[in-house]
Amino acid sequence: MRIYVPLDAAAKALGSDEVAEAITQEAKTRGIDVTVVRNGSRGMVWLEPLVEVATDLGRMAFGPMDVGDVPALFGDLAAHPKALGLTEELPWMKRQTRLTFARVGVIDPLSLAEYELHHGLKGLRNALAMEPAAIVKEVTDSGLRGRGGAGFPTGIKWKTVHDAQAPQKYIVCNADEGDSATFADRMLMEGDPFTLIEGMAIAGLAVGATQGYVYTRSEYPDAVSQMQKAIEIARAAGVLGASVLGSGRSFDMEVRVGAGAYVCGEETSLLNSLEGKRGIVRAKPPLPALQGFMGRPTVVNNVISLASVPVIMDRGATFYKNFGMGRSLGTMALQLAGNVKYGGLFETAFGLTLGEIVDDIGGGTASGRPVKAVQVGGPLGAWFPRGLFDTPFTYEDFAAKDGLIGHAGLTIADDTVDMLQMARFAMEFCAIESCGKCTPCRIGSIRGVETLDRVLNGDPSALPILTDLCNTMKLGSLCALGGFTPYPVMSAVTHFPDDFQRAKAAAE
């Protein structure tokens, strides 16, 4: 008997460790031979802990489980009060296009043998048979763009590093996932770390880098542990090291843990932190692709960007770019959070409308009240009202509506949320997290909080000042922290003017 219990941090917070232990003890009491596999999460967080039992028909899902539900797993499974049916037949799973997350929740995350049985290392083996320039071209042709926020074409970044002449080059994975409503990086590192390792190794082969670093945050102890264990296993198996899979070509990597500063999610601030310096933003140029880590050419890519590379190298650029629309190609790992009925991770091709994502996939609000707004792209993302729910989920369509996709985290809010308070929170967040290097961000965010406090106290005449301030921050900040903070502020002003006028009425 084989039973799967998630080791994902969200599942553990909801009691999956206790459920796993209860299954082991119950099996021992009954004298039944049971293998408990600690897998990654399937992404249905509202059903965690989600336990799966392997049957002749496939894996049956049960959830949300607690310790008291365990004994019934050893009886008639179909009659179990928490039985949900076959996992792959659940509506949440059937509607997805899982490419990057195809193995998450399916395999034992630290079993290299299981990883290979599910298309693992095929992309790396294909890459080893190609010239570096051909690997770069394949990634370029796929249309893959940065999944961390900027949406910059991955192939162009790789080509810049490939063409640079230097005695040492580096691959740096930005796993400093600090945005609200984002957890895809963590879920992948915990549930399928070999995919990230394979993607980084391919990147190294493509650009001539022999050393890689995964920079993640101290708030992710489980992800750090999983990545470190997986790297050791990969190194012992010859996937990493002086001769990758016996090819004679070298690539190795390690995990570095940051202290949790939000601004270290910005690539140059991250590189400073990685070098042991204060995490402050560098002026550009020079670009990290030319002078990055230790002044050497460096590829800095997000976890999901790098984890998307193995499937591209396995199945080809043409296969990958058949998903999506326009210049937004491939799939995106949507993360639904906030006041949402069905929160979790949902991987799908670009192109669904925001309304389909919030209403059909997310099921609306958990409170049952009407959806008022959705913030897309973390704390620096714009707030979208229901009137814009027909917007297709692509980089271009969101940019046309003065928004951004960012890391594809969606925070849903119902009609009780005051958007003036949300605008103030955005400015306050920027003030707290600013590295302090540039004046528009350091001073602008403080003045922004003060200006919004005037509005809160019934002075709408401060709104033109707020608009000018946001324009200054947007155009003058060194990085996206100050440059993108105007998105949530101005979208709240534009789409929810009643919330700003209400403060004046209350003051009077």
Task: Place the predicted regions along the sequence by residue.
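Conserved phosphate/anionic-ligand binding catalytic regions in large, soluble enzymes, centered on
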Residues: A11-K12, W46, G120, V139-V161, ...
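Ferredoxin-type iron-sulfur electron-transfer modules in oxidoreductases and energy-metabolism complexes
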Residues: L14-V37, T55-L77, K122-D141, P167-G178, ...
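Gly-rich Lys/Arg/Thr-decorated short loops/hinges at beta-loop-alpha junctions or inter-strand turns
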Residues: I107, L112-K122, C173-D185, P288-F293, ...
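Intrinsic disorder at enzyme termini
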Residues: A78-D108, P286, F293-S305, M313, ...
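Accessory "access/gating" subregions that flank catalytic or transport cores
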Residues: R125-Q165, K321-N322, R327, Q335, ...
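Hydrophobic alpha-helical positions that pack around
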Residues: V224-F350, G362
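Short amphipathic, charge-patterned alpha-helical segments
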Residues: A27, G199-A201, A349-A366
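Histidine-anchored nucleotide/phosphate-binding helix
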Residues: D192-A206
